[in-house]
């Protein structure tokens, strides 16, 4: 979805039964990151994931792509089993590190009337 700044990515899994009457849960995540400076403090290039001592290092690797993936995978598995009790709408933006205004605007103006902030 186009916004004044960065796009808002929206996807949805519908409830396995009675989706039109099921509540909708929103899972929010972001794909932007803080600047990598100062570069001299990095032990490896910030945008090249590197494993050291069993840990993954890269700019943005822990904030919050993994958490959103877990929610996405769980919803997909429940949907595949016919066991998803609610609609799950995933929203992901590129503005969280700078205020996240587009997600707020979307929630307040959702033309489907399904979400309200």
Region spans (language model):
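Acidic/histidine-rich catalytic neighborhood of metal-dependent amide-processing enzymes
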Residues: 64-117
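Acidic/His- and Gly-rich active-site-bordering loop/insert found
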Residues: 1-61, 78-88, 94
């Amino acid at each position: 979805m186009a916004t004044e700044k960065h796009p808002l990515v929206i996807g949805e899994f519908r409830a396995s039964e009675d989706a039109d009457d099921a509540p909708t849960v929103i899972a929010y995540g972001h794909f932007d990151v803080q600047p990598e400076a100062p570069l001299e403090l990095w032990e490896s290039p910030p945008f090249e994931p590197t494993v050291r001592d069993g840990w993954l290092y890269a700019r943005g690797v822990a904030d919050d792509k993994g958490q959103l993936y877990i929610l996405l995978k769980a919803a997909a598995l429940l949907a595949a089993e016919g066991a998803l009790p609610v609609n799950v709408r995933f929203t992901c933006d590129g503005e969280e590190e700078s205020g996240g205004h587009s997600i707020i605007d979307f929630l307040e103006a959702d033309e489907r009337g399904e979400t309200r902030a």
